[in-house]
Amino acid sequence: MSGGLDILRLTADDVSKMLAASAHLGTTNVDYQMEQYVFRRRTDGVHIIDLRQTWEKLLIAARIIASIENPADVCVLSARPYGQRAVLKFAKFTGASPIAGRFTPGTFTNQIQKAYREPRLLIVTDPRVDHQPITEASYVNIPVIAFCNTDSRLRYIDVGIPCNNKGAHAIGLMWWLLAREVLRLRGTISRDTDWEHMPDLFFYRDPEEVEKEEQAQNNKWAAPEQSPALSAAVPSSAAPVEEWSSSPSKETTEWGASNTAAAAKSSWSNETGGEWGAQEGGEWGS
């Protein structure tokens, strides 16, 4: 589909990204309709997908998406958790209508329910998991674009993009490549410069890991460091403050000892009292 144009050819940078994200790895099983996209079979039974055909199918899908005048008429869907973040990011940059999570049966066929939609194009992440919307789209003649693995069935699928649709990084990268190509065809971004948004923005993130990162960040801001000016104002060689309650002071000890000695010398209550009592008693008695 590149038509021999150098500007549409698969670059080495994109190939390295696909290989790093394992977008070329299929499964051990292969559907008879997907055999044409298999490059070879490894000794462990895993089928390798031909990335050149992946890129050609990606260009076809991008041209179909760019040909729709109203971007909101494009419905992107992913029931698989690894593709929900990628679907939301794709809808944010291209203006499509996302459905992340469980698909409500009858969304495309039941006009009574509030979630009823009439899209002109449907894009799904996995034909096996998203079989319900694909079946409903076939009832109302909605064309379907799907990311297909080697074991995916192509029934009711108009354009199948062969890739690894089970890996978290592979799904995010394929949605990122599709969004970038759509924006290039619309003229939003240039082909001469790289897109400012990186592929990891479309990658799946574990909610527990995100919560741990936020908690660590909050703990970091909750414990501010001591100001340098304040630490410089307090000298480090300051004399330690003694606790007066632990040991009595020298003055208190000396004062208590002197009072005790004075009290011992002036014990007039025993000596004087005895002489006075004896003298008075003798005089009165005589």
From Swiss-Prot:
Q: Where does it reside? A: Cytoplasm
What main location does UniProt list? cytoplasm
Task: Please provide one cellular component term from the Gene Ontology annotations of this protein.
Answer: cytosolic small ribosomal subunit
Q: Name one GO biological process term.
A: ribosomal small subunit assembly
Compositional bias (Gly residues): 274-286
* Ranges of compositional bias, category Low complexity: 227-241
The positions making up the signal sequence are: none
Q: Which GO terms describe its molecular function?
A: structural constituent of ribosome
Q: Which InterPro entries match?
A: Ribosomal_uS2, Ribosomal_uS2_C, Ribosomal_uS2_CS, Ribosomal_uS2_euk, Ribosomal_uS2_euk/arc, Ribosomal_uS2_flav_dom_sf
Alphabetical list of PROSITE patterns matching this protein: RIBOSOMAL_S2_1, RIBOSOMAL_S2_2
| PANTHER family per UniProt | 40S RIBOSOMAL PROTEIN SA (PTHR11489)
Job of this protein: Required for the assembly and/or stability of the 40S ribosomal subunit. Required for the processing of the 20S rRNA-precursor to mature 18S rRNA in a late step of the maturation of 40S ribosomal subunits.
Summary of subunit composition and partner proteins: Component of the small ribosomal subunit. Mature ribosomes consist of a small (40S) and a large (60S) subunit. The 40S subunit contains about 33 different proteins and 1 molecule of RNA (18S). The 60S subunit contains about 49 different proteins and 3 molecules of RNA (28S, 5.8S and 5S). Interacts with ribosomal protein S21.
- The name under which this protein is listed is Small ribosomal subunit protein uS2
